[in-house]
Amino acid sequence: DEQARILRTLLQNNRKRELEQASFTLLYSGMSLAALTHLTRHRMQALCAPDLLENADYNRFVLPESVRKAGMESRYREAFSIAEAAARKLSSMSAGKDALSYLLVSGLKVPVVSTMNAGELYTFFRLRTCERAQWEIRELATEALKVLRAAHPALFSLYGPTCFMTGACPEGRMCCGKTAQVREKFSGTL
């Protein structure tokens, strides 16, 4: 239809300025500090995260499947308990935030609100839904894309990893080797 044709034309432009007029706000209710570092690399966004030291909850963390499969879940949980005990001890000694910040473990979960325009989301989804992206940010980005596709299918059905959007993988020798499966996945409903 005409709307889809116009959107495809916009996505083929190098500048994509028209896409900057539409903004979308997403809530990530439990993103690890590790994934947050990937999100903050996208400079064209308004990002709201709580004060990490005041809101650190050492009982809310991401448990990677690789840790579980390695049989290291109890040791992993213990690391958070040790970090929490050290943070309490330093706090009781009136340690400054500069010292306490070193005890923030990358797996801690925080709620994050991000607002990006459709142009920045184009870049975000191309990079972060790729099989080569860090696993957690890839899962969060794929879920965000699923939500946006449900709300705005005409535009966001065209978004996804680069191989889906252009038909070619930009990773060269580092390609995941699953281009056909990835393209099929993103051609569907996710």
Regions found by a protein language model. Give the residues of each.
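Family-specific signature for flavin-dependent thymidylate synthase
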Residues: 1-190
